[in-house]
Amino acid sequence: MSNHSKVSVPTATQQTALKFVLLIGILSFFADFTYEGSRSILGPYLASLQASAFAVGVITGFGELLGYSLRLVSGRLADRTQKFWPITILGYVVQMASVPLLALAGNWPLAALLIILERVGKATRNPPRDVMLSHAGKQIGYGWVFGMHEALDQFGALFGPLIVAWILALRGDYRLAFAALAIPAVINLSLLMLAYRTYPHPEEMEGNPPDIQTQGLPRVFWLYLAGAALVAAGFADFPLIAYHFAQASTVSPHLIPVFYAVAMGVSGTGSLVFGRLFDRFGFSILIVLTVIAALFAPLVFLGGFWLALLGMAIWGLGMGVHESIIPAAVAPMVSPQRRASAYGLFTAGYGIFWFLGSAMIGFLYGISFSAMIAFSVVLQLAAVPLFLLVARQTSQPQQNRGNSG
């Protein structure tokens, strides 16, 4: 009963934590609006600047790889200096400035530099920002915090490309579309400075530090990273799924974006639900959702129109799990003093295995559908025993832990 009353009547610190998460979530909405809007047209824009298909592949692939690997550096730097806000602000400034500057790129090498800088900015700001969010999670539940944040992220990622598509439909001008994205970029940076001034010390929400080892990272973290890496490696990227829909004529070309929108809607809504369920039930909910999400591959690659739509909804469910529960579970495993390094390492490893797995899935697509689907499903299900081990080594569900202080 006492636990229930705590949730029903939030303390002042819990109210502060909720307001902080909502503010970070809203500024993240405008960040995703900006860079996902730009990324939806990067391919054709580079082509208009006479970049070859090979150049486009190298630019985007190298940008993604750099964007994940640099999180190791950013996370370690944040832990060492404890300058979470300055590093976060630097990352956002670099990222938000890079997007509208694409309107001024006169050639594809300059555009490539800006595209890579945008990824560097994201890599710089993510680990310290996630640590600050995790402080709020100590008060209101790690799953709820990351679920709310991801839901707002996803809606930004949905509206940004839609507005860009609307601008292109009206004017057919890539440069105008990039220039228009300066508006959400400025809103993002304004809200970022408001958050910094309003909540200069989010670590105060942590309360009493948890009794977790501070030397190195605990064994349970490495087990969890191994399981998450398997899930990431088995998950197909949407461009390959869209490519298959077009090649197999499963879905009409004009409906493919609708399928993606359905997936994003499930992902954004699911993030909220899954985060709350994780706080209440712990790792058992992650295990159940991992098994369900593994079913997307046979549905999207072998099914007809309606089964493919169901598969995309399940794919979106998986994305919601990836973006809410999976990062939320890292925070209580690691002491606050090591958390930025842990997030940097975790997201770098997760991203690199996603990249390698996507490459293998794409390779198998041209050889054998059966092998490709088996690769995807087996790798995701192989994470379940590791998650079971992690569940045994972690304590009570995260909401209880968050409210115990």
Regions found by a protein language model. Name each.
Residues 86-100, 182, 284-299:
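Structural signature of the two symmetry-related core transmembrane helices
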Residues 10-64, 223-252, 256-259:
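Helix-loop boundary and gating motifs at the non-cytosolic
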Residues 70-83, 168, 270-282, 365:
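Helix-to-loop junctions at the C-terminal end of transmembrane segments
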Residues 103-115, 300-311:
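Helix-loop junctions at membrane interfaces in 12-TM secondary transporters
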Residues 114-155, 329:
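Cytoplasmic helix-loop-helix junction between adjacent transmembrane helices
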Residues 282-326:
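C-terminal transmembrane helical hairpin of 12-TM major facilitator-type secondary transporters
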